[in-house]
């Protein structure tokens, strides 16, 4: 799931996530939502739907400093964490950056999207292993 509000950053995050998923032979679909606050709702809808996925990757970015940016980021991450504690397997690739340049560095050079995808895959594997105990 990708938040498209900052499209250039979202594209870079998706590139990293897609590469990581492809490297691991994972099948996936790309779903877009407007912004980071819509990510948890969309993932919850998919997870509770008739054909849930094994794992989800949340990708998006909040730019700027100050109370509004901090609140958007914190609330999106809080809701994603809550989904995780309720058993939804997901990797969180939501970024908070001062500006687009910093966000592009996190998304590209630091491969935040790939890291989120690998986290989701690792958690999906862990869930399978724990189910066998």
What do the PLM-derived regions correspond to, one by one?
Residues 4-5, 33-35, 61-62, 94-100:
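Short, ordered loop/turn segments at secondary-structure junctions
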Residues 42-80, 133:
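Glycine-rich phosphate-binding loop
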Residues 24, 53, 86-87:
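Helix C-cap/helix->beta junction micro-motif
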Residues 1-33:
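Glycine-rich phosphate/diphosphate-binding loop of Rossmann-like nucleotide-binding domains
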Residues 30, 54-59, 89-96:
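Short beta-strand segments at enzyme active-site cores
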Residues 22-50:
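Active-site rim loops that border cofactor/substrate pockets in soluble metabolic enzymes
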Residues 69-133:
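C-terminal binding/interaction regions
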Residues 4, 8, 12, 34-37, ...:
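Residues at secondary-structure transition points
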């Amino acid at each position: 799931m990708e938040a498209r509000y900052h499209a250039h950053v979202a594209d870079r995050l998706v590139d990293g996530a897609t590469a990581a998923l492809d490297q691991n032979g994972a099948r996936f679909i790309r779903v877009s939502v407007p912004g980071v606050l819509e990510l948890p709702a969309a993932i919850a809808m998919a997870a509770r739907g008739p054909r849930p996925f094994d794992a989800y990757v949340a990708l998006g970015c909040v730019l700027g400093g100050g109370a509004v940016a901090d609140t958007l980021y914190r609330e999106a991450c809080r809701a994603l964490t809550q989904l995780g504690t309720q058993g939804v397997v997901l990797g969180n690739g939501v970024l908070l950056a001062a500006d687009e340049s910093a966000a592009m560095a996190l998304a590209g050079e630091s491969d935040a999207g790939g890291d989120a995808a690998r986290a989701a895959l690792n958690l999906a594997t862990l869930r399978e292993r724990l189910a066998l105990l």
